[in-house]
């Protein structure tokens, strides 16, 4: 028998020291738990994160009310449900909330239950989580998008762009990809030290040096790649997360300097950076409602680089369909807490693959030691994973889980494809 006997939720803390929800689901004496992450720069259309805004003991950031709702309501509603019936369970959770953006129960409460159910199902079946998610029979490992310099909302320096990342495009295995990133990161650390800057890290483990312009950061990264013995744009690619929602004012953007400029000027500046620094991926280059700007950039780049929608799509099927019709992007970032259940997330991934989009599984800036997204990336045959740098254990834990899976798969293990 695989009937859920009880569900216990508790308040724990994420990597930024903020309260979050951990939910443990039981089938008799067997249990599995999941911790919900939290974002810093969030899209307007994301599912709602419920907090106790009137609880002054935790400065309005506690999650004690959603924890209580799980323990008193969801636990009773899901009792005796078959733990393997993920879709049925998720649909009940969606109905319990009854709002478009999960504002009644909160996506943080719902997701912690949804993931814990899948983990427990895998445990009872005695199979790895990624095999319990399998979209197809491939066991392909994703390319890591490693955040090596933090800016924007993830750091307190003057950088406009939120994340400067590297991707080891010529890696023949996941472990080789991590090794390549490791070398570049160490060379970058040495360069930052020589400049007299601190090598302290931001929320996602990337360095946060006190430099004030995007090009200075890009030049540093190119130098680190070269010193590592790699070719920029071939062996290792530079990728950006602009988080342009944070830089939008009166239909103008302050992406490339503090001065706000038009969409056309911003696109010209992007094209210069792409050509000069061989950038292969740009996430959220424009605001979440600026569909025409996205389309212009995609056309100007002739679909030759990865244009990734995060705040644009918020892991939402309706938003993705609009983006597809507008020809706005060619890739989607997948964040489970943006939509709130595994079932809804899988629907988005399946549609993205159907229309030829690359899927990139992502952490959040407020994350935890939970490694579920590592299995999720392989189980959904996603092209890339974005889960920070080789620093901070809540980031490294995901890479370590992928290394374990690669080792377990042995000769069956292979890397995904980077076009």
What are the functions of these language-model segments?
Residues 11, 21-38, 146-168, 223, ...:
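Short beta-strand elements
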Residues 139-202:
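Mobile "lid/hinge" segments at catalytic clefts and subdomain interfaces of large enzymes
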Residues 215-419:
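Catalytic core of soluble alpha/beta enzymes
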Residues 163-174, 198-214, 243-256:
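Active-site-proximal beta-alpha loop/turn segments in soluble metabolic enzymes
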Residues 1-20:
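Short, Gly/Pro- and small/polar-rich lid/capping loops
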Residues 13-15, 98-117, 144-156, 201:
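Glycine/serine-rich anion-binding loops at beta->alpha junctions
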Residues 37-127, 131, 178, 206:
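Metal- or metallocofactor-binding catalytic centers and their adjacent structured scaffolds
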């Amino acid at each position: 028998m695989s009937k859920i006997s009880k569900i216990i939720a508790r308040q724990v803390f994420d990597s930024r020291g903020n309260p979050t929800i951990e939910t443990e689901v039981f089938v008799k004496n067997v249990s599995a738990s999941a911790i919900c992450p939290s974002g810093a720069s969030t899209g307007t259309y994301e599912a709602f994160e419920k907090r106790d805004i009137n609880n002054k003991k935790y400065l309005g950031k506690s999650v004690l009310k959603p924890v209580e709702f799980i323990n008193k309501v969801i636990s009773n509603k899901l009792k005796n449900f078959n733990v393997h019936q993920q879709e049925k369970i998720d649909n009940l959770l969606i109905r319990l909330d009854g709002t478009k953006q999960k504002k009644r129960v909160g996506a943080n409460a719902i997701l912690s239950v949804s993931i814990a159910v899948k983990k427990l199902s895998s445990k009872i079946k005695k199979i790895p989580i990624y095999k319990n998610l399998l979209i197809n029979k491939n066991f392909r490992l994703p390319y890591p998008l490693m955040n090596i310099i933090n800016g924007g909302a993830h750091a307190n320096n003057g950088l406009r762009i939120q994340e400067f990342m590297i991707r080891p495009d010529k890696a023949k295995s996941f472990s080789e990809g991590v090794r390549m990133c490791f070398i570049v990161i160490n060379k970058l650390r040495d360069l930052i030290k020589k400049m007299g800057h601190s090598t302290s890290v931001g929320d996602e483990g990337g360095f946060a040096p006190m430099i004030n312009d995007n090009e200075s950061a890009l030049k540093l990264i190119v130098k680190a790649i070269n010193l590592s013995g790699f070719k920029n744009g071939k062996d290792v690619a530079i990728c950006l997360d602009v988080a342009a929602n944070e830089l939008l004012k009166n239909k103008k953007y302050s992406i490339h300097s503090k001065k706000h400029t038009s969409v056309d000027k911003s696109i010209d500046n992007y094209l210069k950076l792409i050509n000069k620094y061989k950038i292969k991926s740009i996430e959220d280059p424009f605001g979440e409602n600026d569909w025409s700007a996205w389309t212009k950039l995609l056309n100007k780049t002739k679909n030759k680089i990865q244009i990734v929608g995060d705040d644009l799509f918020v892991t939402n099927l309706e938003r993705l369909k609009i983006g597809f019709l507008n020809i706005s992007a060619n890739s989607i970032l997948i964040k489970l807490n943006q939509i709130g259940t595994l079932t809804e997330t899988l629907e988005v991934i399946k549609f993205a693959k159907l229309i030829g989009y690359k899927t990139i599984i992502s952490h959040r800036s407020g994350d935890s030691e939970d490694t579920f997204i590592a299995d999720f990336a392989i189980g959904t045959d996603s092209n890339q994973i974005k889960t920070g740098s080789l620093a901070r254990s809540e980031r490294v834990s995901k890479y370590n889980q992928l290394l374990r899976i690669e080792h377990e798969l042995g000769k069956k293990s292979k890397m995904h494809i980077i076009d």
